[in-house]
Structure formats: structure tokens, C-alpha cells
Regions:
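N-terminal secretory signal peptides that target proteins for export/translocation
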Residues: 1-11
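Sec-dependent N-terminal signal peptides
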Residues: 10-18
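Charge-rich, low-complexity N-terminal segments
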Residues: 30-157
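Short acidic-hydrophobic surface loop/beta-edge motif
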Residues: 33-40, 181-183, 209-211
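Signature of long, low-cysteine stretches enriched in small and polar/charged residues
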Residues: 149-203
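Long, compositionally biased interface segments
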Residues: 196-249
């Protein structure tokens, strides 16, 4: 299963590379040379093109719809998705060759910025969504991890397999596990982390930080390997500083 998943990921990355060669000149055509520009909630953001992975998406047709390259672009257009990679911890443009090679376990940060259309100023609603009761999911008791400064709960979802998975079969599994971490400040949740489980190796391997930047009307997602979780405060802070530094005044 894991080998198949890795094969699928490699195929998807190859497909994205081909699309990138076709789309990139059109996507960046209406931006200042070497930069990608657009708006989030009226705030103009311009970032060096070297940070962009694949392509930025603008309001209009989705990137899988014919004619989407004709969407309005540039500083007067609204972003719908701004995907980037950055090295860690210096937040320089990420090495794309490493990104394509390492995939989900990329050694830097993968950042995606999207418009935020809710009135919330924090991410409490997403924590509550992750912890909602479902018939096929069970939750361990919530604990507080002092050395991280985060609450944690593990959620397990049973996967129906046919034929049933044999207990000692190392290559099949019937559970999907997520680890949810979050911080709390005065009862509100400024950031939540969704960490993915690698069943054959029985370990968490990648986390997604989700937080709101109300000052620019954006939802921010940052993906990183589990080893960086103890640095979560720096990851959130430096990502915020990076994004704010690219707002055009």
C-alpha cells in the first residue's frame, strides 16, 4: 500500500511538472518580472517567483478547468491559492529539486495561503471540527504536553477491508490515525496541527499547521515533518512575518 502510494505521488508530481511547463508562462504573464502578485481581502501581496511551487491560482476558473489561464492576474486580481516552499529556518526560496525528490517529507516548509471567508479571528472552529464525534472514529483522552505547550489527542478511524486484514500482515492495515495538537490562549485556539500517521512504520511523519491571519484576511497552512513540531512557535511566527513582509503598503 505504501509503495503504491509513493508510486501515485511520483506520478502526480510528474504530471504537475508537465503542467507547470505549460502553465507557468501564462500564469506569470501579468505579474512584474520575477514576482507573483495578487490580493487577499484587499491586501496586495507580492512574492518572488522563486518561492512559488507549481502555480498561483486566481479568482475565476479553477486550474483544472479549460480556460483558467485567462483568469485575471496581477496585483489587482484576487488570489484563491498561493502555494510556496521555503527553506527552514532561514525562510529563503525552497530548493525545488529537493521538493520534487522528497515529496511530502520535504525538509523545508510548504506554505499555502487561501482567502479566509469566516468572521472568526482564530482557528477554534477547525479544532472543534477535527474533534467532532463520528461513528467510525475513536479518540484517546486529551492530554497536555508540557514540553510542547500543546494539547494532544489521537483519533483512530477503522477502515473496512475485504478480505479482512490478518493480524500479522505487515503490508496491510485497517486503521487510519491522526494526531491533533493545538494551543489555547484564554480558551481560544490560535493554531491547530493535524499530524499524519505512517502505518507500516508506526510513526507520525508529517504535520499541517493551520492558523488564521485576520490582518490580511487569510487562512494559512504550513506543512512540515514531525521532527520540527517542537519548533512550532517559530514556524508560525516566521511564517507570519514572512507573509506580512510581502504585503505591499
Amino acid at each position: 500500500m505504501v509503495l503504491m502510494n509513493k508510486f501515485i505521488v511520483r506520478c502526480l508530481i510528474s504530471l504537475f511538472k508537465i503542467m507547470l511547463l505549460i502553465i507557468s508562462p501564462l500564469t506569470f504573464a501579468e505579474n512584474r518580472p520575477g514576482f507573483v502578485c495578487g490580493k487577499f481581502n484587499g491586501h496586495v501581496m507580492e512574492v518572488p517567483k522563486k518561492y512559488i511551487i507549481y502555480w498561483a491560482e486566481y479568482e475565476g476558473k479553477s486550474s483544472w478547468t479549460p480556460g483558467f489561464t485567462k483568469n485575471k492576474k496581477g496585483c489587482d486580481a484576487n488570489f484563491t491559492s498561493l502555494p510556496m516552499i521555503a527553506s527552514w529556518p532561514d525562510m529563503q526560496p525552497g530548493d525545488k529539486s529537493k521538493w520534487y525528490k522528497q515529496g511530502l517529507e520535504y525538509e523545508g516548509l510548504r506554505i499555502r495561503v487561501e482567502p479566509f471567508r469566516r468572521s472568526d479571528i482564530d482557528i477554534t472552529y477547525k479544532r472543534d471540527f477535527f474533534l467532532r464525534k463520528q461513528n467510525d472514529r475513536t479518540f484517546d483522552p486529551v492530554i497536555y504536553i508540557d514540553n510542547l505547550g500543546l494539547f494532544f489527542v489521537e483519533a483512530t478511524r477503522k477502515i473496512a477491508r475485504f478480505p479482512p486484514v490478518e493480524k500479522n500482515d505487515p503490508y496491510r492495515f485497517d486503521e487510519d490515525v491522526n494526531g491533533y495538537y493545538w494551543a489555547e490562549v484564554n480558551g481560544r485556539v490560535p493554531v491547530v496541527f493535524d499530524c499524519q500517521w505512517l502505518p507500516l512504520e508506526k510513526r507520525y511523519y508529517i504535520c499541517e499547521a493551520i492558523f488564521v491571519m485576520a490582518e490580511i484576511g487569510s487562512l494559512v497552512r504550513v506543512f512540515f515533518t514531525i521532527e520540527k513540531l517542537p519548533q512550532w512557535r517559530a514556524i508560525v511566527s516566521r511564517t507570519q512575518q514572512f507573509l506580512l513582509s510581502h504585503i505591499k503598503r
